[in-house]
């Protein structure tokens, strides 16, 4: 019987526009396809698993002898953000999109926030995080006022220089914002965005922290935890689920740390799930339209993936997917509404398998629920029985 699932989310690595992408301004987007096309990178490990069988990729070939199961998944939820994507992977469909603020946050929200933190704020508009600290960083240093901004996603972001507003105080401000932002203004995430440096040379640090809404219903993580299984969160997973359904967690500063932490978790978890988010694709490269950086990050993951695969036992199942797109070749810097890849591998698989087009990310949750005999997850369809696993596993 399968005993462990290693679930890795390559944050923002979408594989082509969803049929309704035009409604989100994302017609023609294809994060992975465009990055591969522009850079000519090769991804031999994921090619071996069947990545090139999911969509046509210029320099990643289809593999008739793929050792993994492969397919792509559509997002059923109404959105294209991190919280929505991860919650759906865990079995929760978000039918009403989280609120967004293209004109900035309402006066009453900002006034309440300023009153609670005891100081004014700067910004209060949609902006790129790197651009707004360039624009307002110097004024922030002079005044001590935090920079509040949003994006096309449902986020309330607070940027502050670590020497002006210490991290613990910034995190406290985020907790205050999280308390205020409820009801009609229940944004998906409040995000701390600390930075360092001097005017003209500001750099965001790895001390970002996300303060998510609590999931509005049970996820497969809750079901696993209640049944006594380990749920080991790596990266920002604990934040995305507001700690719900998590038994152990480690926060990481970048993809490399996330991969290493996943490998270390494989020594700590005997029965249960390791759930990893690798954020650099999205945060460092996608939102900054850095195509070459995105390609290097994909290549680096592909080069380190064998370290994980070689540690897999017959009772382990590896699932690699994504939560949305963030096509760095588009003029915009926001997430894109795309299909996500699905790669599944176990040493106990006899051959590769085409898992086709899945109607929802929640198929991952349904599969995990079936493996551990929890649930059921009614929002998705398990693909466990479609996997060519050896008898008795």
UniProtKB/Swiss-Prot annotation:
GO molecular function: magnesium ion binding; manganese ion binding; phosphopentomutase activity
Cofactor: Mn(2+)
One GO location term (cellular component): cytosol
Keywords, comma-separated and alphabetical: Cytoplasm, Isomerase, Manganese, Metal-binding
Note accompanying the cofactor annotation: Binds 2 manganese ions.
GO BP field: 2-deoxyribose 1-phosphate catabolic process; 5-phosphoribose 1-diphosphate biosynthetic process; metabolic compound salvage; nucleotide metabolic process
Annotated EC: 5.4.2.7
Keyword Nucleotide-binding found: no
Reactions mediated catalytically: 2-deoxy-alpha-D-ribose 1-phosphate = 2-deoxy-D-ribose 5-phosphate; alpha-D-ribose 1-phosphate = D-ribose 5-phosphate
SUPFAM superfamilies: Alkaline phosphatase-like, DeoB insert domain-like
Pathway info: Carbohydrate degradation; 2-deoxy-D-ribose 1-phosphate degradation; D-glyceraldehyde 3-phosphate and acetaldehyde from 2-deoxy-alpha-D-ribose 1-phosphate: step 1/2
Pfam family, one: Metalloenzyme
Annotated InterPro entries: Alkaline_phosphatase_core_sf, DeoB, Metalloenzyme, Phosphopentomutase_DeoB_cap_sf
Residues the record lists as binding Mn(2+) 2: 282, 287, 335
Major localization class: cytoplasm
Gene3D superfamilies: Alkaline Phosphatase, subunit A (3.40.720.10), Phosphopentomutase (3.30.70.1250)
Compartment(s): Cytoplasm
Residues the entry annotates as binding Mn(2+) 1: 11, 323-324
Similarity annotation: Belongs to the phosphopentomutase family.
Function: Isomerase that catalyzes the conversion of deoxy-ribose 1-phosphate (dRib-1-P) and ribose 1-phosphate (Rib-1-P) to deoxy-ribose 5-phosphate (dRib-5-P) and ribose 5-phosphate (Rib-5-P), respectively.
The protein's name: Phosphopentomutase
Species of the source: Caldanaerobacter subterraneus subsp. tengcongensis (strain DSM 15242 / JCM 11007 / NBRC 100824 / MB4) (Thermoanaerobacter tengcongensis)
């Amino acid at each position: 019987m399968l005993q462990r699932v290693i679930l890795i989310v390559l944050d923002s690595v979408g594989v082509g526009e969803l049929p309704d992408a035009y409604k989100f301004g994302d017609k023609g987007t294809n994060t992975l396809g465009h990055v591969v096309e522009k850079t000519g990178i090769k991804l031999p490990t994921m090619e071996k698993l069947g990545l090139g069988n999911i969509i046509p990729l210029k320099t990643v070939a289809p593999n008739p002898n793929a050792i993994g199961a492969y397919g792509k998944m559509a997002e059923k939820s109404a959105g294209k953000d991190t919280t929505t994507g991860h919650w759906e992977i865990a079995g929760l469909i978000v039918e009403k999109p989280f609120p967004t603020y293209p004109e900035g946050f309402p006066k009453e929200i900002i006034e309440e926030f300023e009153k609670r933190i005891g100081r004014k704020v700067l910004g209060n508009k949609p902006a790129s995080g790197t651009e707004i600290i360039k624009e307002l960083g110097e004024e922030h240093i002079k005044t001590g006022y935090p920079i509040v901004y949003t994006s096309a996603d449902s986020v309330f972001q607070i940027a502050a220089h670590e020497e002006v507003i210490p991290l613990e105080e910034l995190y406290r401000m985020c907790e205050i914002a999280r308390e205020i932002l409820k009801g009609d203004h229940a944004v998906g995430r409040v995000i701390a965005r600390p930075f360092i440096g001097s005017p003209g040379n500001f750099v965001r640090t790895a001390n970002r922290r996300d303060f998510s809404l609590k999931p509005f219903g049970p996820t497969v993580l809750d079901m696993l935890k209640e049944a006594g299984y380990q749920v080991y969160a790596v990266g920002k997973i604990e934040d995305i689920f507001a700690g719900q359904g998590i038994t152990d967690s480690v926060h990481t500063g970048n993809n490399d740390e996330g991969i290493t932490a996943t490998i270390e978790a494989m020594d700590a978890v005997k029965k249960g799930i390791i759930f990893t988010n690798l954020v650099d694709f999205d945060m460092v490269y996608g939102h900054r339209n850095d195509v070459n950086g995105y390609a290097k990050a994909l290549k680096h993951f592909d080069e380190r993936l064998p370290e994980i695969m070689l540690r897999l036992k017959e009772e382990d199942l590896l699932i690699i997917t994504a939560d949305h797109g963030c096509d760095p070749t588009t003029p915009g810097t926001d997430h894109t509404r795309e299909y996500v890849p699905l790669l599944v591998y176990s040493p106990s698989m006899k051959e590769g398998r085409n898992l086709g087009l899945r109607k929802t990310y929640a198929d991952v949750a349904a599969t995990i629920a079936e493996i551990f005999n929890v649930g059921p997850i009614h929002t998705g369809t398990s693909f466990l029985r479609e996997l060519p696993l050896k008898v008795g596993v």
